[in-house]
């Protein structure tokens, strides 16, 4: 029979394990030279080998013949009873077999110890990496001095060089020693995470190391993206390395300059967040509209970041380039660019932003834990900026204005701003009138509001248009709502004097319904506008308003 036939396994057994189990010494001796190595080392389903069976049946010579042909694993295999060939031989008293197995074990242990010694004898490169990881700069520097370029340029199993380790651990002096001794290829090495020594140096804020590395880097590695989609420019901006950013920008591709990382940040957002005004000004002309208007994962735009950092010029440069959505953007804490601009007293920015912003965005209130509930108007009241206050009032909700007036002690400048604002809504004035302490102040605001409507009315009448009457009645409705709503709400005796004052004001003020009629008379007499221009229905409406206000004299004037 040939080797292939003899080496077959049947039900987990070979002919050799059968012969050994049955104690057939001569059969075993004849089989061993003809069996394959795999068959000799075969382990049956009970964990026994031909060697363990030979030991059980006392075939010492067969054991001695098998041992040199078997693997260490098969010799030391433990069967289902927990026995090895050596333990069986000891139980059986097979001295020669025990000595042989013990010698093999001792030899194996010596080999293990020798290998351990070899593996524990560390190379200079391994020692250097250990020193860097331990941040032992003195030890690392001492090792570098005695190492050649080939040793220093090795890449370890984690795809790191000594230089990337030193840069990642922020060891500036170690990096300074390494750079002159390393090849350009290793300096430009990109690890499995997309990092280079330069990206690590930028991440660690090592300005001098970045300066030393950049001239040695290829265009490709300078524009390399990390696994977080960061460029070295974004990383340098994050660490406020303005000088490095200045050096990098001319070397970066358009794609790299407009790159968005996994946090949604661009180099521009990073630079603005780090107060790098010059870098922002250098980046903006090079960036696409899409990148300039990009919103990061936290809801911030470059404009919000610039306003937050107090970069007035950057904001002024950005605003004309921002979309309506980006200008009105509120971040995840509901802070807008306007809130930050007002908070940082960026008056010019506020003046440009406010007309461009929606009512909702202007009245957005912050959920930031440091200024929870603050709106742009809240910051105005804290900063005491009357001019910005005047700009905000027409777009600020009455509720916000009333709440601020109730809470703040310094009300005077707010009242003055309201008084000087021609666009204060009737609702705001009505609500402010309800604040007892502010009623006298608001008389001025009422006068202001009426005077503005008078001017508008005169302009309308000058147009000599029959539709003017309709516009006039709309104006009267606004006026009527302003006072009538207040008078119906406040009916206590305490408010009687003020009520009388307001009624007198109504009678004497130029822009009452009666005042409108008086204004019409000279124009009728001069044929500039004729009473026939007004329909009977419109005249009836005017008369109704006048009668409701009990102004009989003026009604008679109209006929």
Curated annotation (Swiss-Prot):
Keywords: ANK repeat, Repeat. SUPFAM superfamilies: Ankyrin repeat. Coiled coil: none annotated. Pfam families: Ank_2. Disulfide bonds: none annotated. It comes from Rickettsia bellii (strain RML369-C). ANK repeats lie at residues 11-40, 46-75, 81-110, 158-189, 228-257, 263-292, 298-327, 333-364, 372-402, 524-554. It comes from the Bacteria. PANTHER family: ANKYRIN REPEAT AND PROTEIN KINASE DOMAIN-CONTAINING PROTEIN (PTHR24198), ANKYRIN REPEAT-CONTAINING PROTEIN-RELATED (PTHR24198:SF165). This is Putative ankyrin repeat protein RBE_0902. The keyword Nucleotide-binding does not apply.
């Amino acid at each position: 029979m040939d080797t292939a036939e003899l080496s077959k396994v049947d039900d987990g057994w070979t002919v050799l394990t059968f012969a050994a189990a049955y104690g057939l010494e001569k059969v075993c001796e004849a089989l061993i030279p003809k069996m394959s190595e795999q068959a000799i080392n075969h382990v049956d389903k009970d964990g026994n080998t031909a060697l363990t069976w030979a030991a059980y049946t006392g075939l010492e010579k067969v054991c001695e013949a098998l041992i040199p042909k078997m693997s260490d694993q098969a010799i030391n295999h433990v069967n289902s009873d927990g026995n090895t060939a050596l333990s069986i031989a000891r139980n059986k008293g097979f001295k020669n077999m025990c000595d042989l197995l013990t010698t093999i074990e001792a030899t194996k242990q010596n080999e293990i110890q020798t290998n351990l010694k070899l593996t524990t004898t560390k190379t200079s490169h391994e020692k250097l990496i250990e020193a860097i990881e331990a941040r032992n700069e003195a030890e690392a520097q001492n090792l570098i001095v005695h190492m050649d370029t080939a040793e220093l340029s090795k890449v370890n199993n984690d795809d790191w060089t000594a230089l990337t380790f030193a840069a990642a651990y922020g060891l500036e002096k170690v990096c300074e020693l390494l750079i002159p001794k390393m090849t350009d290829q290793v300096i430009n090495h990109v690890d499995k995470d997309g990092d280079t020594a330069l990206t690590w140096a930028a991440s660690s804020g090592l300005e001098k190391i970045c300066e030393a590395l950049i001239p040695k880097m290829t265009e490709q590695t300078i524009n390399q993206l990390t696994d977080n989609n960061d460029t070295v420019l974004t990383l340098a901006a994050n660490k406020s390395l303005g000088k490095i950013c200045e050096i990098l920008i001319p070397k970066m591709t358009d794609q790299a300059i407009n790159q968005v990382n996994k946090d949604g940040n661009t180099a521009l957002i990073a630079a603005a967040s780090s107060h790098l005004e010059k870098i922002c000004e250098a980046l903006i002309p090079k960036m696409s509209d899409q990148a300039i208007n990009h919103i990061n994962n936290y809801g911030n735009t470059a404009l919000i970041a610039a306003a937050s950092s107090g970069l007035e010029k950057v904001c002024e440069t950005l605003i004309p380039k921002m979309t309506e959505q980006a200008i009105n953007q509120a971040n995840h804490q509901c802070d807008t660019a306007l809130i930050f601009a007002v908070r940082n007293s960026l008056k010019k920015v506020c003046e440009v932003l406010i007309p461009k912003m929606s009512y909702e965005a202007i009245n957005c209130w912050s959920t930031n834990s440091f200024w929870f509930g603050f709106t742009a108007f809240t910051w105005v009241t804290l900063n005491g900026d009357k001019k910005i206050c005047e700009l905000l009032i027409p777009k600020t909700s009455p509720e916000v204005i009333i709440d601020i007036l109730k809470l703040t002690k310094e009300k005077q400048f707010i009242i003055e701003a309201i008084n000087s604002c021609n666009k204060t809504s009737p609702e705001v004035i009505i609500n402010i009138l309800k604040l007892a302490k502010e009623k006298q102040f608001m008389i001025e605001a009422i006068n202001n509001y009426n005077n503005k409507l008078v001017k508008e009315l005169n302009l309308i009448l000058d147009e000599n248009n029959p539709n003017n009457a309709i516009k006039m009645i709309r104006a009267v409705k606004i006026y009527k709502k302003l006072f009538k709503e207040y008078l119906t709400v406040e009916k206590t005796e305490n408010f009687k004097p003020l009520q009388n004052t307001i009624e007198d004001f109504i009678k004497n003020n130029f822009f009452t319904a009666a005042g409108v009629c008086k204004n019409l008379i000279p124009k009728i007499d001069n044929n500039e506008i004729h009473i026939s221009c007004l329909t009977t229905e419109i005249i009836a409406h005017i008369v109704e308003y006048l009668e409701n206000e009990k102004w009989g004299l003026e009604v008679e004037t109209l006929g």
